[in-house]
Amino acid sequence: MNLATIWNLPCIFVVENNGYAESTSSKWSVSLSGNASDRAAGFGMPGVEVDGHDFFAVYEAAGEAVERARNGGGPTLLECKLNRYYGHYEGDAQTYRPKDEVKILRETKDCLVKFRNKVTSDGKIDASELDTIDKNVLKLIEES
């Protein structure tokens, strides 16, 4: 990141922050506020924190970072705050998480559900069209 700033490179560093450093909450293992985006200032670049569950927020923030890079504004660190549903590795019992955390996250923050609700309520696409897309994707998965 240092050289990207020194050389004013047109790049975007994307951090997918799921709140855990393997099996330790990042609150216990990361200095500063726990936000990776805050670290960008030390390298002289903008750091942007965005809700990684929100497609449109990520799209907008990434678009601004791309525009900045294309216009000679140098690098950006884009931190997408989100949650993971599965463990850090195959067989991870996730004993470090509250038992109902994943269930609650799936019910309240699922990015696909949020996307579907937003585009259908805004009239951008009909729910039946999304259902058709879902069926086609599931068929492709089944066939592969």
Enumerate the predicted regions with their spans.
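Glycine-rich ThDP/TPP pyrophosphate-binding loop and its adjacent helix/strand module
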Residues: 1-143
